């Protein structure tokens, strides 16, 4: 069993437990009653290389990363530093996240929020919207093709943006076939947890110009952002490098300033 398979087993059990308490009809009603989703795609296409800053307590590869007692305060610091989008981990077992974190961050910031989790079905899509998410992560390696296409459609039908994550060219092709408009290339292989920063540069050039391209994993500082920008990234998603920085607002601001500098490569579109 791969690391991804193990995570998905836990997620399915946790979703079933939540659905036993709050059924699908109730979650759909809560999603319908939520304020309209913010336009994350537009935010990511603003001038300069965007920064998606992540609230991340732990990871399967590193274990505990940061003692985040106040996710709202951290998210507010990210926004003050110039982040375009805030990513919030909601997976409980390996990442120590929660929907309560999503709620807290939603109350604290006025920019789009990404629910970062392992989505396995429509319940979680409506759940994300009900808790204020504007973007949902869909991982190609975790989904059959029909389910991927269906979940992209459902996400967009609720006014949200689907960030479709890939790690190989085959997965990128699947994402395009399913209708993805925003594609994240993860340098980390979720089946082995190994990181290869060259992955983005191998996959992104083959994506259509109109696709919004996000580089995920491996950003430790401005040099990494500039390298990803040179390979065609519209934005970078950064978690560990921010929560371990000691000054998250400054760490975000440094990345944002590098991405806005005239010498930074600009995406062609």
From Swiss-Prot:
Reactions listed under catalytic activity: 1-(2-carboxyphenylamino)-1-deoxy-D-ribulose 5-phosphate + H(+) = (1S,2R)-1-C-(indol-3-yl)glycerol 3-phosphate + CO2 + H2O
TM regions (residue ranges): none
GO terms classed as biological process: L-tryptophan biosynthetic process
Keyword Amino-acid biosynthesis: yes
Regions annotated as coiled coil: none
Family listed: Belongs to the TrpC family.
Entry's Gene Ontology molecular function annotations: indole-3-glycerol-phosphate synthase activity; phosphoribosylanthranilate isomerase activity
Alphabetical list of CDD domains matching this protein: IGPS (cd00331)
Enzyme class: lyase
Protein name as annotated: Indole-3-glycerol phosphate synthase
Keyword line: Amino-acid biosynthesis, Aromatic amino acid biosynthesis, Decarboxylase, Lyase, Tryptophan biosynthesis
Signal sequence bounds: none
Protein EC: 4.1.1.48
Pathway membership, UniProt: Amino-acid biosynthesis; L-tryptophan biosynthesis; L-tryptophan from chorismate: step 4/5
């Amino acid at each position: 069993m791969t690391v991804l398979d193990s995570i998905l087993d836990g997620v399915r059990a946790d979703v079933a437990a939540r659905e036993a308490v709050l059924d699908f009809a109730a979650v759909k009603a809560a999603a319908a009653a939520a304020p309209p989703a913010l336009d994350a795609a537009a935010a990511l296409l603003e001038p300069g290389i965007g920064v998606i800053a992540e609230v991340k307590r732990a990871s399967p590869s590193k274990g505990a990363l940061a003692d985040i007692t106040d996710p709202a305060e951290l998210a507010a610091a990210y926004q003050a530093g110039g982040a375009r989008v805030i990513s919030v981990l909601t997976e409980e077992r390996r990442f120590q996240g929660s929907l309560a974190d999503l709620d807290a961050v939603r109350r604290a910031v006025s920019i789009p929020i990404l629910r970062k989790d392992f989505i396995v079905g429509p319940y979680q899509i409506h759940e994300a919207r009900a808790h204020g998410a504007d973007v949902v992560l869909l991982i190609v390696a975790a989904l059959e093709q029909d389910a991927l296409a269906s979940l992209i459609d459902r996400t967009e039908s609720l006014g949200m943006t689907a960030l479709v994550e890939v790690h190989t060219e085959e997965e990128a092709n699947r994402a395009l076939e399913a209708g993805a408009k925003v594609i994240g290339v993860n340098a980390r292989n979720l089946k082995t947890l190994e990181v290869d920063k060259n992955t983005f540069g191998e996959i992104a050039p083959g994506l259509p110009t109109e696709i919004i391209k996000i580089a995920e994993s491996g950003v430790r500082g401005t040099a990494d952002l500039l390298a990803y920008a040179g390979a065609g990234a519209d934005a970078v998603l950064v978690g560990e490098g921010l929560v371990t920085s000691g000054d998250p607002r400054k760490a975000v601001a440094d990345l944002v300033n590098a991405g806005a500098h005239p010498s930074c490569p600009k995406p062609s579109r």
